[in-house]
Amino acid sequence: MSEAEIKDKVYDIIVSKMGVNKDQIKPESKFSDDLGADSLDTVELIMELENEFGVQIPDEDAEKISTVQQAIDYIVKK
């Protein structure tokens, strides 16, 4: 899967889980500050990314993922 395909899927997951418009999402968008996620939203988002991409994201790594681009980069590396 290409990085562009991963980006599109990540954006789609954010739209469905967080109820934001796709045009509100930017690579530098922070889940909490820019997209209005609380800690539970972030946990659910990480779980959905794990399910969608078949990766395990340990808690210590999940804590470091705070922006859209960090999520994309993490998945690309896996």
From Swiss-Prot:
Domain of life of the organism encoding this protein: Bacteria
Any one annotated GO CC term: membrane
Alphabetized GO MF terms: acyl binding; acyl carrier activity
Protein localization: Cytoplasm
Keyword check for Magnesium: no
Modified residues (O-(pantetheine 4'-phosphoryl)serine): S39
UniProt entry keywords in alphabetical sequence: Cytoplasm, Fatty acid biosynthesis, Fatty acid metabolism, Lipid biosynthesis, Lipid metabolism, Phosphopantetheine, Phosphoprotein
Pathway: Lipid metabolism; fatty acid biosynthesis
Keyword Methyltransferase appears in the UniProt entry: no
Domain Carrier positions: 4-78
Purpose of the protein: Carrier of the growing fatty acid chain in fatty acid biosynthesis.
NCBIfam families to which the protein is assigned, alphabetical: acyl_carrier, PRK00982.1-2, PRK00982.1-3, PRK00982.1-4, PRK00982.1-5
Family: Belongs to the acyl carrier protein (ACP) family.
Protein known as: Acyl carrier protein
Organism name: Chlorobium limicola (strain DSM 245 / NBRC 103803 / 6330)
